[in-house]
Regions:
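Accessory interaction regions appended to the cores of large information-processing enzymes
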Residues: 1-383
Length: 383
């Protein structure tokens, strides 16, 4: 039945909403407060490039990627701005294999790159305030950085605080976990994955006029961190002071954005930066006589066994291992267990790359991206 009006409590079917994702709010009036968006526990941890075998099929590929993204919010599609490649990112190699299979089933021939693990950049301590100057040297900003508290991240995960939530309620929630009142009131933005910028300046002139430019510089930095041009995670940025030129001509985006990013990067590099790698939880079901083989595979893959449970003649082994070590897991596990083990993988958490490996991992990432092998120093972003 087609109706023009439906009261609360009913479930309608809507047609023609081609670009609407699951969890979005649809409204015909403005302004309106959207419903809380759907929060997904997992984040994309593996990415690959995909392109059509024939250039004429590019529009079809773009359309298919858009539809896949709408149907599966955990699958992220993007464009590499430097190479022009279309990238798909998901929760693991199997997730990407399913996506590419769905594409080829439409009759479109594609080629793909080898899957690459996604890393995150983070800090382990507090640093700043660090001063950054605009390219024309007429304006300057002071920034502090620190790891975002676990309690705040939990509030984000639960949806109690969000970018589009009530600011008064957000401030109250932050005060309840120990934030000072001025910090709680000064939150400008909450950005994925779990980052926040806070204004604690007092009586700064022209601040509202440059606010969007500061946010743009901050988000520019979040998108590609200074260590390996990987996305930054779990960062709290505080603006502690700012001095702006009185003439708007001298404080435009070309001045404010790089000023903000440079100060943020200098502080970031002082605050004991590190790389985070995605960790997968592996659950394995295997006959008891093959328990040693399974635990051996997990250990060989830089992993650890979390629990072992006996149920009848079968043993259930739960462990954790880095995503980068799972690419050939099928072959290794089959070889060690003669194909008698059944297992599944799911994203568990982000964990710092071991100190013994971080230099080589950073160099590999920077080499792949065409960067110099040595990461920048704080002084590279300071006057």
């Amino acid at each position: 039945e087609i109706v023009g009006r439906l009261s609360a409590g009913n479930i309608p079917a809507l047609l023609g909403l081609e670009n609407v994702k699951a969890g979005e709010t649809i409204a015909s009036v403005k302004p309106f407060v959207p419903f809380e968006s759907v929060h997904y526990v997992t984040e994309p941890v593996v990415t690959m490039a995909v392109e059509p075998k024939f250039a004429r099929d590019l529009p079809k590929l773009v359309d298919l990627l858009r539809k896949l993204n709408l149907e599966d919010p955990n699958l992220v599609t993007s464009i590499n701005e430097e190479s022009g490649e279309y990238l798909i990112s998901g929760m693991g190699t199997l997730h990407l294999e399913i996506a590419t299979t769905l594409i080829t089933k439409t009759g479109l021939e594609i080629t793909t790159s080898k899957p690459i693990v996604i890393y995150r950049e983070a800090i382990r301590s507090k640093a700043g305030p660090v001063e950054g100057k605009s390219p024309n040297r007429h304006s300057k900003i002071s920034i502090e950085v620190e790891p975002l508290e676990d309690a705040v991240i939990e509030l984000m995960k639960s949806g109690k605080i969000s970018e589009y939530g009530d600011k008064t309620e957000m401030a109250r929630s932050l005060r309840e976990i120990g934030w000072e009142a001025d910090e709680a009131r000064g939150v400008w933005s909450i950005d994925e994955p779990y980052n926040m910028i806070v204004d604690v300046t007092k009586g700064a002139q022209y601040m509202q006029e440059v606010r969007d430019m500061i946010l743009a510089g901050y988000r520019w930095g979040l998108k590609e961190g200074p260590i390996a041009y990987e996305q930054i995670r779990g960062l709290k940025v505080k603006i502690t002071d700012i001095s702006l030129h009185e003439d708007p001509v001298h404080r435009g985006p070309a001045q404010i954005m790089p000023m903000t990013r440079r100060a943020m990067f200098a502080a970031f590099l002082i605050a004991q930066p590190t790389l985070l790698e995605p960790i997968q939880r592996i659950t394995t079901k295997v006959p008891g006589d093959l328990l040693g083989a399974v635990t051996s595979v997990v250990s060989q893959k830089r992993g650890k066994v979390v629990s072992v449970d006996q149920k009848g003649h079968l043993v259930y082994v739960t462990g954790e291992l880095p995503t980068v070590e799972t690419f050939d897991l099928s072959e290794v596990m089959r070889g060690q267990t003669a194909g008698r083990a059944f297992w599944g993988l799911e994203f568990a958490r982000w964990s710092p790359v071991p100190a013994s490996l971080i230099q080589s991992v950073v160099e590999q990432i920077r080499k792949r991206k065409g960067l110099s092998l040595e990461p920048p120093k704080p002084s590279d972003f300071m006057e």
